[in-house]
Regions:
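C-terminal non-catalytic interaction modules
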Residues: 1-21, 25-28, 255, 260-314
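Short coil/turn linkers that connect adjacent helices within long alpha-helical scaffolds
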Residues: 7, 41-46, 96, 147-152, ...
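Residue register of alpha-helical TPR repeats
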Residues: 15, 50-57, 104, 109-111, ...
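Structural register within alpha-helical repeat arrays
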Residues: 20, 55, 59-62, 109, ...
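Helix-turn-helix repeat elements of alpha-solenoid scaffolds
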Residues: 22-38, 63-91, 126-143, 170-182, ...
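Structural motif corresponding to the intra-repeat A-B loop/turn of tetratricopeptide repeats
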Residues: 27, 62, 116, 170-171, ...
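Alpha-helical adaptor scaffolds
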Residues: 159-179, 183-191, 204-250
Length: 314
């Protein structure tokens, strides 16, 4: 008897395919999400652009959590497909959906640029010292432009979120960042539905992820100011929202912050036991950056330590 392999092809609505890949991406199943998207066949420029954008976002999150280097070629490919889409309009004005696609691509480029600044040779590096000042300034300008061009409130909220991250982690402007996080929080809680990408897809989980991210960083500022009760409130809610949205690696990284509060309260044994499990779980799913953060905590590193301000030349 000879076994023969056959490939079964079936038609699936594009929105459902991308939504399924999005759930896999958020859950940390980046390879499976990529294979699913790459298996899709599309014949029109818009569908090809949407598939390429979704694949680029999977690659970007794999780079962030898994320490891979996959996003750059995926972003380049997505850029080409978006160019083809815009060229296909042949002078006709772009509709709202196509404007959303262009914004989403630009936002992925912002996120990739930010990652390149805070992750250097595999190490998370914050603060302005030893950094070309033009690069953070360009990211800030990029995020400001995205905020101004955002087609809806959730996307505007994500631009605000990255303005806060750039201020916090690249410029060490700790007094500036919270205002951006508060604006992001308001946008996420308002619940305007976005399109594709981090700000869109499933209405609830898209909003949940933005609210989670804002609460995560606002809680960090609460912690720095010694308001541990407020930090716990925000971090606990962020953990809950992340779990509801299905972000497995993000929820693990959030639990590390809760362990910081356990350590602050004097329960070192409890904090260590908690983070030891987080490190094990993160390693099991390939979330290498979260595992490294957890192992740093076990070695005594404070993951909430603020970046140092720029040293004066005087």
């Amino acid at each position: 008897m000879t076994n023969t392999a056959s490939t079964l092809r079936t038609a699936v609505p594009l929105d459902e395919l991308i939504a399924a890949a999005r759930e896999l991406r958020i859950g940390g199943r980046w390879e499976r999400a990529t294979r699913l998207l790459d298996s899709g066949e599309a014949t029109d420029p818009r569908s090809r652009a949407l598939l390429a954008l979704a694949a680029a976002e999977v690659a970007l999150e794999s780079d962030w959590f898994g320490g891979t280097a996959l996003a750059e070629p995926r972003l380049a490919a997505a850029g080409l497909f978006v160019e083809v889409l815009l060229a296909s309009l042949d002078g006709k004005p772009a509709d709202e959906a196509q404007s959303d696609i262009r914004w989403d691509l630009d936002f992925l480029r912002l996120r990739h640029g930010y990652l390149g600044q805070v992750r250097v040779d595999g190490v998370f590096r914050v603060g302005p010292d030893g950094r070309d000042p033009d690069a953070p300034a360009a990211l800030r300008t990029h995020a400001e432009r995205l905020r101004g061009e955002a087609p809806d409130g959730v996307r505007r909220g994500w631009a605000e979120m990255y303005l806060g991250l750039v201020a916090d982690n690249l410029f060490a402007e700790r007094d500036v960042a919270p205002g951006h996080y508060e604006a992001a929080l308001c946008a996420g809680e308002a619940g305007e539905a976005g399109g594709t990408g981090e700000a869109g897809g499933s209405h609830n989980s898209g909003d949940d992820l933005l609210v989670r991210e804002a609460l995560r960083h606002l809680g960090d500022h609460d912690h720095d100011h010694g308001d541990h009760a407020r930090a716990r409130e925000r971090w606990s809610r962020a953990t809950e929202l992340g779990a509801r949205a299905g972000t497995v690696p993000g929820t693990l990284s959030q639990q590390v912050l809760l362990a910081v509060l356990t350590r602050d309260a004097g329960d070192e044994a409890g904090a260590v036991a908690m983070v030891r499990e987080i490190a094990r779980w993160a390693g099991a799913i390939g979330a290498m950056t979260t595992e490294a953060q957890a192992r740093g905590f076990l070695a005594g590193v404070d993951p909430t330590a603020p970046p140092a301000p720029a040293e004066s030349d005087s």
